[in-house]
Structure formats: structure tokens, C-alpha cells
């Protein structure tokens, strides 16, 4: 259950001026309808995203809608890999006003395992700021080593830690502090370039 909660958080806060109203919802699957909520003063667009959690042979998809900032709309695809058998990825789309009523939801392309020759330390700690690291093979656009440490949890969550390969887009999103959760909790995020895999 805690693992699924972590995965939800990964997706739920993948999207964060003017005061506009955006639909808010999170559902398993692809059809998401919810309530209207006024966005924050720095949020000037609505964001819909589809997130997939893959751990062969299982794959879980959920869709969410929330407020966001237009300067992150071009960062429409992100992925992370904290474990050689686990992949987290998301596709995002922005809209405003009536456009949100007709804009088709983002759709993730079929996942293809594509090792890119890079590696990072990876692990997940669901109840601690520390976790036991091991080397993870990066895939596709994952060229960064991402570390997330949740020190001061909110929403009644325990401490958490996450390390693994990540796409540069995901690191740029964190750099822009797009994640609403960062505003209410003490979260350390660090990205460094992934390193070439050593020959065995």
C-alpha cells in the first residue's frame, strides 16, 4: 500500500500569474473527472497527465488533472527508474479555458526497454531518509541520477527516500519547483549526470 501511495505521489505532483480554475482529480485508468479549484497566483495553466508504473509483468496506469505553470508545458514526458525491474513514467499536457473540454488526454507510447549504457545508484526507502543503494541500468532518455529525500512529511506520510535514473525533463521540473508538495514539506532534490556503465 505504501508503495502504491509513493507511486501516486510521483504522478500527483508532476504538474503544478493569473487566478484560473482547473479541474482536479486522480483516478486509476484513463478517464478523470473531478471538481474545479482556483489555482495559485503563480499557476497559469491546467495540466492533465497520464502516469504509468511498470513492474513486469504488471503495469498500473492512472490519470490526474491539476493546476500548473506554462513554463513547464514543454517538459511533457518524464521517466525515472529506481530499480532494474521498476519504471515510473508520465506524459503531460497543458490547456486553459474551453480548450480543456476538448483536449484529448495525453497518451503514453508503449514502453520499450532501451538500456542506454548509463547507470546510477538506485533505491526506495518508504519509511526512511536512507535506503540501501545498488546500481541501476538507465534506459531511454534517463541521463540523470535523481535523489529525493522527504524529511518533513505532510499528509500524514512517513519519511521517504528515492534514488535512481531519471530523464533530464524530470530534473528540470523539480528545478522549477513545479511540485506543490515541495511547498508544504521539507524535500531535498538533487540531480547529477549519470555515469557510463562499467564493463563486467
Swiss-Prot record:
Compartment(s) of residence: Secreted
This protein's superkingdom? Eukaryota
Would the keyword Metal-binding be found if you checked this record's keyword annotation? no
Q: Which UniProt keywords apply?
A: Disulfide bond, Phospholipase A2 inhibitor, Secreted, Signal
GO MF term list: phospholipase A2 inhibitor activity
Signal sequence region: 1-19
Q: Which Pfam families match?
A: PLA2_inh (PF02988), UPAR_LY6 (PF00021)
Q: Which GO terms describe its cellular component?
A: extracellular region
Among InterPro entries, the record links this protein to: CNF-like_PLA2_Inhibitor, LY6_UPA_recep-like, PLipase_A2-inh_b-type, PLipase_A2_inh_N, Snake_toxin-like_sf
Between which residues do disulfide bridges form?
Answer: 22-46, 25-32, 39-67, 73-94, 95-100, 120-145, 138-165, 171-191
Gene3D superfamilies cross-referenced by the UniProt entry? CD59 (2.10.60.10)
Subunit field text: Heteromer composed of subunit A and subunit B.
Q: Which family does it belong to?
A: Belongs to the CNF-like-inhibitor family.
Q: What does this protein do?
A: Inhibits the enzymatic activity of the phospholipase A2 (PLA2).
In its miscellaneous comment, the UniProt entry states: Concentration of this protein in the serum is 8-fold lower than in the E.quadrivirgata (another non-venomous snake) serum. This difference may reflect the difference in the food habits of these snakes. E.quadrivirgata preys upon snakes including the venomous snakes, whereas E.climacophora only preys upon small mammals and birds.
Q: What is this protein called?
A: Phospholipase A2 inhibitor gamma subunit B
